[in-house]
A protein has these predicted regions:
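Acyltransferase
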Residues: 200-248
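Surface "functional belts" at beta-alpha junctions
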Residues: 8-10, 33, 100-204, 233, ...
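DPxDG-like acidic metal-binding loop motif
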Residues: 72-106
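N-terminal beta-alpha supersecondary unit
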Residues: 6-75
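Residues at secondary-structure transition points
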Residues: 41-49, 80, 84, 88, ...
Length: 248
C-alpha cells in the first residue's frame, strides 16, 4: 500500500500511538487538540493494553474509526517489543481503514515538546532560552538513546546510542546548561555532575507529545508506506537467556 498524498490542507482527526518505552499511551486529536486519551505506566503490557485503550477511546466517545484521517505512531528508538506492537497495530488500522500512516521520532516528540514548553521544566533561576534539551531513553546498563535540541526545538545532535560517562556532553555543558530528561536520565545523574547539568522531574514518552508533529506531518503529506514501514530500532534486538528464563 503506497503512501497516500493529500491534495489540500484541512483539520485532521488523528489517532496517536506511543509504545516505545514502558508507557502505553494513546490519544485522539483533531487539529492537534486532544479529544480523548488513555495512558498506563504499568510497564511493558502493551500487547494487553494497546487495543483495549483504542477500543475504549472509540466507544466512550461514540467515535466511528472511519472518521479517522490518519494514524500516527512513535517510531523509536526504544523498546524493541514495544515498538513492534505499536507499529503493528498502527499499520493494521491504516490498512483496514485505507488511511495514511504517520511516523514520529520518539526523541523528536520528547525533545521538541519540552523545548516548546521550556518554562515548565527549566528552573526559574536559569535562562530557559539558553538551555539545551537532551531527552534520554533507557537502553541497557549505562547506555541511552538520545539526541540534543536547542531552545527553539531544533535538533543539533542526531539520534544516537551513547554510553554515558563523566565527560559526556562536556563540550556543551562547558558553555551552557543542558536539561536531561526521559526514562534514561535518572541512571545518568550520578555520572553527569557538571554544574550545568540539569535534570527534570518525571517526564516520560507520551502520545500527547506527538500531537503537534503528527499534525504538521499530516498537513505536509509526510506519510509512510504502510506495506514497508519498520520501526527505527537504532540497534539490533538482543535476546538474553539467563539460566532458565528468557527475557526480551
Amino acid at each position: 500500500m503506497p503512501a497516500i498524498l493529500l491534495k489540500e490542507k484541512r483539520m485532521a482527526t488523528i489517532l496517536n500511538i506511543e509504545t516505545a518505552t514502558e508507557v502505553c499511551s494513546v490519544n485522539l486529536t483533531r487539529d492537534g487538540e486532544i479529544l480523548a486519551e488513555k495512558e498506563s505506566h504499568e510497564g511493558l503490557n502493551h500487547s494487553r493494553l494497546l487495543t483495549v485503550f483504542i477500543d475504549e477511546i472509540f466507544r466512550e466517545n461514540n467515535f466511528n474509526p472511519e472518521q479517522l484521517d490518519a494514524v500516527a505512531v512513535s517510531k523509536g528508538p526504544g523498546s524493541y517489543t514495544g515498538l513492534r506492537i505499536g507499529v503493528s497495530v498502527a499499520k493494521g488500522l491504516c490498512y483496514s481503514l485505507g488511511i495514511p500512516l504517520i511516523a514520529v521520532g520518539t526523541l523528536d516528540a520528547l525533545g521538541k515538546y519540552t523545548a516548546d514548553h521550556k518554562n515548565k521544566f527549566v528552573p526559574d533561576s536559569t535562562d530557559a532560552d539558553n538551555v539545551l534539551f537532551c531527552p534520554m531513553i533507557d537502553a541497557r546498563r549505562m547506555e541511552v538513546y538520545t539526541a540534543l535540541f536547542n531552545a527553539k526545538g531544533e535538533k543539533i545532535e542526531p539520534v544516537s546510542a551513547k554510553i554515558i560517562e563523566t565527560n559526556s556532553f562536556s563540550k556543551y555543558l562547558n558553555r551552557q546548561p543542558v536539561l536531561f530528561f526521559g526514562n534514561g536520565a535518572v541512571k545518568c545523574k550520578a555520572a553527569l555532575t557538571h554544574p550545568n547539568a540539569l535534570f527534570s522531574g518525571p517526564l516520560k514518552a507520551s502520545a500527547r507529545f506527538m500531537n503537534k508533529l503528527a499534525d504538521e506531518k499530516y498537513n505536509n503529506n509526510k506519510f509512510e508506506d504502510v506495506a514497508y514501514f519498520e520501526p527505527f530500532y537504532l540497534k539490533n534486538f538482543i535476546a538474553t537467556v539467563p539460566k532458565n528464563k528468557i527475557l526480551e
